[in-house]
């Protein structure tokens, strides 16, 4: 809390040690919901693929490359120009784009009758002509599909819902439309875009030209699996210069990948031998990463195939009137991310939300365990602390017994709070009242601090919630509610069988996580105690209860 520096200085001059010790009085005494680990500084987490993309962008920029955006939609004719006799094999892996045709729609007398019944009026000659004009413009492409309903609605003075119903029931041509393929494809390689871009740049940029692009590509795989996705990201670069050799690719490989911790590079001829590369220049890049050594992935040796480069063939470049040699290097972003993040499955890495398996860290589990009801006021928090202190001090006292825990003013009423156990031959509190909630081996346990559970406290994550702490906050909350209403209260806890019985709330997502892995939520035990509050005699708002 805020303090007066002048007052502190004056007190320190008179009694420095005492003033220093009283410094604790200025510290916040938070409720259970505001203590660590529930009190935290959460931060968003980037997706591993996009984090890797950003790192690649920064790495290329540091090497002096300029970022470009290449065309995503590429006509099949361009693929034939680039790949020559291999084009059909490449196009077999491409997604072709299709579109709905624009039907030629007539308006007969019977259709006008149906329209009138839907919109609830006879269309005027001007409205009929406007409707015909809009449908004709739609056929010609002058009116877009998403503008069709509002345009008709405005022309015939009808609601959007009426027009939508009209198009659905009166004009079956719209329902019967089937997509028609085009010759346009989604690029399956970044190379498809590089040829188009370079054909427009070679004559207006000084050599050497160094460009890169990290963007999405699409490949029509038969199915997706741990190593293949139909949509992936390619990190590709090109260097265009009068003098070019494969050594340029080796230098780029080392310069780029060394920024990700790779070292000791090996270069091997690629057996694929694509026709858009000069023979003998298509090279696979292998790199050693010390962080992979001994990992449970297939890269446990530390060596991994990570990239491919080659020099574009003059026969392909000539199709675009490009007169200079061009070296191209590319790597799959998802593959690099798998290596950097230790993932074994591209699907789980890219789309974790779609996978049946999921994981939570122990600290994340602890932060999903909450106290359900807490006092609202500073005085209420003080009452909860006093109840806890009383139970800790007198918890083993034989019963029947009663101890005053707190007395003072709350909401303008003077009250007294007591901890009570009226039954005979027990104690003020049951054996489990000091049990603590700990996350241990993905299980949530309410356990005592005994040698038996030493490993759980040492290796697990402590939530900072004891049974008596959670119960005391519930009691203080109910005391606040009762005092507002001008009455006393009694809060009891007996044998705890579930978390809710001790005022602990488990996030539903956490419950599903624990049960899906057949782990336990074991919060139970005999607590057996009662907290009472009563309005004091002479309270200005009412009588003693």
UniProtKB/Swiss-Prot annotation:
Protein source organism: Methanothrix thermoacetophila (strain DSM 6194 / JCM 14653 / NBRC 101360 / PT) (Methanosaeta thermophila)
- Report the function annotation for this chain: Catalyzes the attachment of O-phosphoserine (Sep) to tRNA(Cys).
Single GO biological process annotation from the record: tRNA aminoacylation
Q: Which Enzyme Commission number(s) are on file for it?
A: 6.1.1.27
Quaternary structure? Homotetramer. Interacts with SepCysS.
Q: Which domain of life is it from?
A: Archaea
Question: Disulfide connectivity?
Answer: none
Keyword Transmembrane applies: no
For this protein, the parts annotated as crossing the membrane are none
**Protein name as annotated:** O-phosphoserine--tRNA(Cys) ligase
Q: Does the keyword Nucleotide-binding apply?
A: yes
Database matches in Pfam families: SepRS_C, tRNA-synt_2d
Q: According to its UniProt record, which protein family does this protein belong to?
A: Belongs to the class-II aminoacyl-tRNA synthetase family. O-phosphoseryl-tRNA(Cys) synthetase subfamily.
The residues that the entry says bind substrate are 189-191, 234-236, 276-277, 328
Q: Which UniProt keywords apply?
A: Aminoacyl-tRNA synthetase, ATP-binding, Ligase, Nucleotide-binding, Protein biosynthesis
- As given in the record, the signal peptide range reads none
Catalytic activity field: tRNA(Cys) + O-phospho-L-serine + ATP = O-phospho-L-seryl-tRNA(Cys) + AMP + diphosphate
> Which GO molecular-function terms appear in the entry?
ATP binding; phosphoserine-tRNA(Cys) ligase activity; tRNA binding
């Amino acid at each position: 809390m805020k303090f007066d520096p002048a007052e502190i200085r004056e007190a320190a001059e008179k009694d420095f040690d005492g003033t220093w010790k009283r410094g604790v009085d200025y510290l916040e005494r938070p409720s259970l919901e505001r203590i660590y680990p529930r009190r935290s500084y959460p931060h968003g987490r980037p997706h591993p693929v996009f984090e890797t993309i950003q790192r690649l962008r920064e790495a290329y920029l540091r090497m002096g490359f300029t970022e470009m955006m290449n065309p995503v939609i590429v006509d099949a004719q361009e693929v034939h120009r680039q790949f020559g006799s291999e084009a059909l094999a490449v196009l077999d892996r491409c997604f072709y784009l299709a579109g709905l045709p624009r039907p030629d729609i007539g308006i007969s007398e019977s259709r006008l009758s149906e329209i009138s019944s839907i919109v609830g009026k006879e269309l005027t000659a001007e409205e009929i002509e406007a409707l015909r004009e809009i449908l004709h413009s739609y056929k010609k492409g002058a009116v877009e599909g998403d503008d069709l309903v509002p345009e008709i609605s405005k022309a015939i003075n009808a609601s959007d819902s009426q027009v939508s119903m009209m198009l659905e029931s009166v004009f079956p041509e719209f329902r019967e439309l089937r997509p028609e393929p085009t010759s346009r494809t989604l690029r399956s390689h970044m190379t498809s875009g590089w040829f188009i871009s370079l054909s427009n740049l070679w004559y207006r940029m000084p050599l050497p030209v160094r460009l890169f692009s990290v963007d999405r590509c699409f490949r029509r795989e038969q199915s997706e699996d741990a190593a293949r996705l139909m949509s992936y990201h390619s990190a590709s670069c090109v260097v265009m210069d009068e003098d070019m050799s494969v050594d340029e690719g080796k230098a780029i490989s080392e310069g780029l990948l060394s920024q990700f911790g790779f070292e000791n590079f090996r270069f091997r001829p690629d057996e694929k031998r694509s026709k858009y590369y000069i023979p003998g220049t298509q090279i696979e890049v292998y790199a050693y990463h010390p962080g992979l050594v001994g990992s449970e992935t297939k890269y446990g040796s530390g060596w991994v195939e990570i990239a491919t480069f080659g020099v574009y063939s003059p026969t392909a470049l000539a199709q675009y009137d490009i007169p200079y040699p061009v070296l191209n290097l590319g790597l799959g972003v998802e593959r690099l991310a798998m290596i950097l993040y230790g993932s074994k499955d591209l699907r789980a890495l890219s789309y974790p939300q779609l996978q049946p398996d999921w994981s939570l860290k122990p600290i994340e589990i602890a932060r999903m365990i909450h106290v359900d009801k807490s006092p609202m006021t500073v005085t209420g928090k003080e009452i909860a602390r006093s109840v806890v202190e009383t139970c800790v001090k007198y918890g083993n006292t034989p019963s029947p017994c009663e101890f005053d825990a707190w007395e003072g003013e709350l909401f303008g009423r003077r009250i007294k709070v007591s901890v009570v156990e009226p039954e005979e031959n027990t104690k003020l509190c049951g054996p489990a009242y000091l049990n603590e909630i700990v996350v241990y081996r993905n299980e949530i346990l309410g356990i005592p601090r005994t040698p038996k559970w030493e490993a759980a406290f040492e290796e697990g994550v402590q939530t900072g919630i004891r049974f008596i702490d959670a119960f005391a906050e519930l009691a203080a909350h109910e005391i606040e509610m009762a005092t507002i209403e001008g009455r006393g209260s009694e809060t009891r806890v007996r044998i705890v069988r579930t978390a809710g019985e001790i005022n602990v709330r488990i996030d539903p997502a956490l419950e599903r996580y624990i049960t899906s892995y057949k782990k336990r939520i074991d919060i139970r035990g005999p607590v057996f105690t009662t907290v009472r509050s009563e309005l004091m005699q002479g309270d200005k708002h009412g009588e003693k209860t």
